[in-house]
Amino acid sequence: AAWFGGFPLQERWNHGYVVRWYGEPGLDATVYTPKVDFKFKNTTGNYLLIKPVVDKTKGTMTFQFYGTKPNWKVEAPKPTIDSRTAPPAPLYIEDPDMAPGAVVQFDWAVEGMNTTATRRVLAADGTVLRNDALKSRYYPWQAKYRFGPGFQPPAGAEVEWANR
């Protein structure tokens, strides 16, 4: 909401990995106590009500802004993906407590990427007030599996053997 509302961002940290249900890569923000935060400046000169909206079904939280309509317009195209990085080879972890030959995936591969989100904030008369860009780097993530005795992980996979 702060990005599309044209508010100047003062602090923003993207997630380390692409998390698809958080929305468009390049527009996410991490908030984590005590240091990682998301900050923007309210430049409207008026109060701003920020309403968090939680959707438990989708597992998402969004924010709605209410206040005096600012006298600027925002042009913000979809973020671009500047480069992609393939995920590492899958990791297979031997678990002697699992049934012989069993295998269970517990984490899924995600490619890494670098993205750029841009926006132009325009005055009512069309004068450009600000051109902004958000650069984000997301690291690749490997698929992870646990397997029981007797299972043979595929060639090329990273393997953690128990008691070897």
Locations of regions flagged by a protein language model:
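Well-ordered beta-sheet/strand-loop patches within structured domains
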Residues: 1-164
